[in-house]
A protein has these predicted regions:
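Hydrophobic transmembrane helical bundles of multi-pass organellar membrane proteins
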Residues: 1-132
Length: 132
């Protein structure tokens, strides 16, 4: 939920609660077993980060509302959770601590995504380009 090639990391000087709360991803987790056993926490994880006081039985409705509100900024992965785990364990080794907004890099130092806008000194997460 907290580690994915599409999720940025923020240095303290640019971190805000909304940015931090949205640095997670909803995943389909062992459908239909996961939602039943774990009350949908994997499938509604973004709404849990927005407000952890939302009861699990209302998290599905909250997630649907967030999808509408966040639009393209809502992160969801319906890939098999074990495939995602394997891919992310290979692609997400470290982040570059020199960037205010950083994305995971693989073992060769190749970033999973780059910030498309802004200079090296003042980068922003708007305009993110994901690499293959």
């Amino acid at each position: 939920q907290h580690t994915d090639v599409a999720l940025p990391h923020y240095k303290p000087e640019v971190w805000t609660f909304p940015r931090g709360a949205l640095c997670t991803i909803d995943r389909s987790w062992l459908w239909p077993i996961g939602p039943y056993l774990f009350h949908g926490i994997a499938e509604t994880h973004v709404s849990h980060h927005i407000s952890s006081k939302i009861p699990h039985y209302n998290a599905w409705e909250a997630t649907e509302a967030l999808k509408v509100k966040l639009g393209e900024h809502y992160k969801y992965c319906d890939e098999n959770v074990f495939v995602s785990l394997w891919k992310n364990s290979r692609a997400c080794k470290f982040i570059d601590e020199n960037d205010k907004v950083a994305f995971y890099r693989n073992v060769h130092g190749v970033p999973s995504a780059v910030v498309a806008n802004g200079s090296k000194d003042d980068n922003s997460d708007s305009g993110v380009n994901l690499s293959d």
